[in-house]
Amino acid sequence: MSDMNHHTIDIAEITDVEKSDKEADFEITDNFERFNQKNDVFRRSWWDANIRSEKSRIFYASYRKPLKNWRQADGFTQKDYAFRNATWHVSDLFTEMKENEDRREGFSDAFPLYRDVAKEKTHFDSPKAAADEIKNIAKRFGADIVGITQYDERWLYTQKFSDMSLTERPNDIPDGLKYVIVTAQKMDYDLISTVPSALSGAATGLGYSHDATVVLSVAQYLRNLGYNAVASMNDSSLNIPMAIQAGLGEYGRHGLLITKEFGPRVRLGKIYTDLPMALDKPLHFGVKEFCGICRGCTKGCPVKAISDGAPTTQTYNQSNIKGIKKWTVNGEKCFGYWAAQNSDCSVCIRVCPYNKDYSKWLYQLGRWLAGTRLRRFMLTLDIKLGYGKRKQPKLWWQGQRQNFNNFIRNFFSSGKQKKNNQKLR
């Protein structure tokens, strides 16, 4: 349990916003505006004529019913779509459960209270003891990373938006929930390696289905202890700034959270609660500095939606939050590619040098180098070893998985090949 809480502090309120932002490396400007969920690019794809199209309609429909014509391209066959859609099934059950009430839980609405809060409360010896127990329980339920932060209204949507009735409505997170438990679930490395493909979308579906069970289970555990709790996925608020405040990782050039354990290959969930717990400090391991010299995601993005410049307050369109100096992604270009491909895209995750299996010593060394002045050497080494290349989906179906030794062989074989080429000259 000790390594789980190495960056924990016993503070229950934001007593100094400026200090809190500095710790999280947030640069908030005077023209900051909270975000309206209606402007999220996925919500816009339902009401905004600039985003909504026949392709976007088919894109969404393909997750619920078969396409009329299957593509023959590797990774886009009926089998690939069948697997992708099956991985979404658990998440879809919750999302569709109350559609007749104009609710899409987990995406437009937080999950409701399925069981009452116990009348008698379980008390803990200290906020740290409470945090330790909740983190342990969350991991038992399947969370891969867990952090705790304070409720920060700046990240809450000003309004929620219904994809079905196309109407705005109040954000109904109950008052008094001052603590947020943020969870991260890793996505499958080998599936992500096949992107772009419908097959790779299974990594996303597995992540969301897993996420739903984790946040619902943790929330119910808290209710059973006598504390109010609300489970949430993409609904109600922006996940990434909360995850950064909770110490799960740093912000990357591609606009994603980069964790120390899995890089950007995670799905995020959260639970709002009134159980007093020790909070986690933001984590820094050199991501901002490394992303400053790396352009892997910028070069890899098929539609050039990722900036190659320095962090800025510039926004591309209404789907970007205003008033924060950071790297910003053009969501309109990004979603347009999703709709055109008829499946979600994770190329920026696949090519990211932080997308590794850190149970291996070599990758741990590389992560350490990325946080030092030797980061350029690490980047060169990463490219030399051939990381981030696309795997043919048919190889995944044949059972081929990530092989650590192959990368080592590639490194030395490429060196030998170079020497042989020089001799031929």
Indicate where each model-derived feature is located.
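Catalytic cores of enzyme domains
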Residues: 124, 135, 141-356, 364-371
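Flanking helices and flexible, charged tails adjoining ferredoxin-like Fe-S electron-transfer domains
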Residues: 2-36, 309-425
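Amphipathic repeat-derived elements
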Residues: 96-121, 252-281, 397, 401
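Non-catalytic, usually N-terminal nucleic-acid engagement modules in DNA/RNA processing proteins
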Residues: 1-191, 197
